Every structure is written in structure tokens, then in C-alpha cells.
């Protein structure tokens, strides 16, 4: 949804924000396209952090894309210095905890530990 809103009245401002993304039933090549659309629209340039929830039931094509959803996302944001958290328990899968939208969170990602605090 975020990538489709780029350049419209529904576009989001990401400067200083922690962006949360997740998806369900998406093809890997579409995840790649959406990540690079967001990157080219400078949505990652001044992010404070990125939280990746469940990428549930991702699909591949007959000719394999060659990367997992996590690898695609890592590649898209590799040049930036903000913290990135994968497998956050918010998704369309079994683990679907609540995440407040619009809250002033702080995100810390370390080896084996993620802290998201208000």
C-alpha cells in the first residue's frame, strides 16, 4: 500500500519516523519493486528505523527470484544507518501483536535483542 501511495495525496512523510512494513501473499519480485520504489522516492533517506513484520506466504515465480524477502529488504536499505528489525511479531500470520501507530517510539536493535519503547 505504501509504495502505491507515492506521489499521491495519501503519500507518507518518513523523515525522523520508524517505518513498519509487512505483507501477505506477495510475490518476491513485487516486494523488490516496492522496496526500490520507496527508495527512489527517498522514503528511506531520513528514517529513524525500519521494522519488518511478518512477510507471510510470500510467493516465487516459476523462474526463482533468487532472494528471500529479508534479503531484498536488506539490499534496499543497506546504504542507510538506521536500525532494522526483522521478524517483528506483527503480521497476517499466527503472531499478530498490536503496534500503536503514530506513537513516538525509540527502536534499538542489537545482537539477538530488539527494544521498541515509547
Mark where each language-model region is.
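C-terminal active-site/capping subdomain that shapes the small-molecule cofactor and substrate pocket
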Residues: 33-118
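ATP/pyrophosphate-binding catalytic subdomain of soluble kinases
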Residues: 1-35
Amino acid at each position: 500500500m505504501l509504495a502505491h501511495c507515492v506521489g499521491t495525496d495519501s503519500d507518507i512523510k518518513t523523515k525522523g519516523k520508524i517505518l513498519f512494513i509487512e505483507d501477505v501473499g506477495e510475490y518476491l519480485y513485487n516486494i523488490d519493486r516496492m522496496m526500490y520504489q520507496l527508495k527512489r522516492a527517498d522514503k528511506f533517506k531520513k528514517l529513524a528505523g525500519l521494522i519488518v513484520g511478518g512477510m507471510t506466504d510470500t510467493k516465487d515465480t516459476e523462474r526463482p527470484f533468487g532472494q528471500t524477502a529479508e534479503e531484498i529488504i536488506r539490499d534496499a536499505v543497506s546504504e542507510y544507518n538506521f536500525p532494522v528489525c526483522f521478524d517483528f511479531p506483527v503480521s497476517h500470520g499466527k503472531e499478530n501483536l498490536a503496534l500503536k501507530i503514530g506513537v513516538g517510539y525509540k527502536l534499538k536493535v542489537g545482537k539477538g535483542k530488539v527494544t521498541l519503547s515509547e
